[in-house]
């Protein structure tokens, strides 16, 4: 790895300083060297070494404003804000045009959640700084803390006007556009940015994300393609290009992208799972199953992998294998209602109705209150002859679905089967009132009830 001249000097200074600590000899460093050493240790979380360097630095350079400002930064880092503020006031009396004094004052107010005051000091710093980009970025962050996304966006854009390579600011601009649901505006801005910086792979990638959000998948692929042409190893752009191809139902192209992703990085369970789904959509069941199995081999605790294999076997109508794999998924996440629902459906297909009833019950207990959960559950209970329990569940469901014909027709059928004809007629009338056309629900699920003369008379009477 080639180091820049500045990095090489910093490395030598660090080696010299650490050698001094080991030998107890005292070496001389200029104040800027000390600043770099201290900031390096702070950035790497070695605060004790930073403090040692600061102490020695101030002994050798007691009047250094730069070192005292680093001291302020350290005090702010340790939440010693009052001491830091006092020291800043002393420095202000000496150097009132030093932008770093205002930046550190802003940091103190920001730490106190006084973001408007922080912005005031940062605006003063703008008068004295040469690094406008950095200050605009800090102002943008303060506005973010205040949830003022418009002004945050405005300042991040100003930062990028000064420094087009500040990718942190670019991400923040896009974050603001996203949060404000301004995808179209984001596209306009990013296109202008790209006109000036055509080789910014990050900008192309963000442009692709905006097109994807607007479901313009052709344009998304186009933008991601440019990002990957500029940087062939841009994994994020490659992955999102693959997702866009999937949306366009271009599954082979998506697979090709995922293959590149695997070459660049160790195969993740997510990539393997996506490839499996693409192969299945192409009708290649053998490759699909192979990649589903690779998915769970890569991450045995990925419940989505096991459930994907379950769904694969359900589509193949191989319910015995589907049952094996859905049990694997439930073993990992036993509180997922969707898994219990599949468990129930698979057991129903295998005519294991008691197990199916247990599955729907567990789905409900895990938070599934969808209409079809109640109807499927009670259909199984009806088959098991548990009419009373089925009625109780459907009556509970009417609290969530008070005007639902599927529930009313089922209640009618169950009450008639239980010889509670008055209640049966009441719910039959409700069903006919809510949806006369779909009265065949009663015929499909309760054929014996449907053929009753009393029921046919009631239907004929309602039609009149």
Regions found by a protein language model. Name each.
Residues 57, 90-91, 124-125, 158-159, ...:
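Canonical positions in the second alpha-helix
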Residues 365, 413-440, 463:
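TPR/TPR-like (Sel1-like) alpha-helical repeat modules
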Residues 43, 77, 111, 145, ...:
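Register position in tetratricopeptide repeats
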Residues 70, 104, 138, 172, ...:
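Canonical tetratricopeptide repeat
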Residues 60-61, 93-95, 128-129, 162-163, ...:
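Structural marker of alpha-solenoid helical repeat scaffolds
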């Amino acid at each position: 790895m080639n180091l820049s001249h500045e990095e090489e000097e910093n490395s030598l200074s660090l080696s010299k300083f650490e050698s001094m600590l080991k030998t107890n000899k005292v070496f001389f460093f200029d104040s800027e060297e000390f600043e770099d050493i201290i900031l390096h240790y702070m950035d790497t979380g070695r605060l004790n070494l930073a403090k040692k360097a600061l102490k020695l630095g101030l002994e050798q350079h007691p009047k250094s404003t730069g070192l005292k400002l680093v001291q302020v930064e350290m005090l702010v880092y340790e939440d010693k804000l009052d001491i830091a503020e006092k020291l800043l006031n002393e420095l202000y009396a000496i150097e009132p045009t030093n932008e770093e004094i205002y930046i550190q004052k802003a940091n103190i107010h920001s730490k106190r959640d006084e973001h408007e005051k922080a912005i005031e000091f940062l605006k003063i710093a703008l008068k004295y700084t040469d690094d406008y980009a950095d200050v605009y970025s800090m102002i943008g962050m303060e506005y973010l803390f205040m949830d003022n996304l418009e002004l945050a966006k405005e300042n991040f854009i100003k930062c990028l006007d000064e420094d087009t390579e500040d990718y942190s600011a670019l991400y923040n601009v896009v974050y603001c556009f996203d949060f404000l649901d301004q995808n179209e505006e984001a596209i306009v801005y990013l296109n202008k940015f790209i006109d000036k910086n055509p080789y910014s792979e990050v900008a192309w990638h963000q442009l692709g994300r905006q097109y994807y959000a607007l479901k313009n998948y052709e344009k998304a692929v186009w933008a991601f393609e440019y990002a990957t042409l500029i940087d062939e190893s841009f994994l994020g752009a490659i992955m999102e290009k693959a997702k866009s191809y999937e949306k366009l139902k271009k599954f082979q192209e998506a697979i090709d992208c995922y293959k590149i992703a695997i070459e660049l990085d160790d195969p993740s369970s997510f990539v393997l799972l996506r490839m499996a789904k693409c192969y299945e959509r192409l009708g290649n069941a053998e490759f699909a199953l192979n990649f589903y199995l690779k998915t769970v081999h890569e991450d045995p605790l990925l419940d989505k992998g096991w459930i994907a294999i379950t769904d694969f076997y359900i589509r193949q109508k191989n319910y015995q294998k589907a049952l094996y794999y859905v049990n694997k998924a439930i073993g990992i996440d036993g509180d997922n209602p969707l898994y219990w629902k599949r468990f129930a459906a698979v057991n129903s297909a295998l005519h294991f109705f008691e197990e199916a009833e247990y599955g729907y019950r567990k789905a409900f207990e895990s938070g599934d209150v969808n209409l079809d959960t109640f109807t499927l559950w009670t259909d199984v209970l009806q088959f098991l002859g548990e009419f009373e329990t089925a009625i109780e569940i459907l009556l509970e469901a009417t609290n969530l679905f008070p005007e639902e014909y599927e529930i009313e027709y089922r209640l009618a059928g169950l009450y008639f089967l239980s010889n509670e004809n008055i209640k049966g007629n009441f719910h039959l009338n409700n069903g006919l009132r809510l949806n006369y056309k779909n009265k065949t629900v009663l015929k499909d699920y309760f054929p014996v009830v449907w053929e009753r003369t009393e029921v046919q008379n009631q239907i004929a009477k309602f039609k009149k």
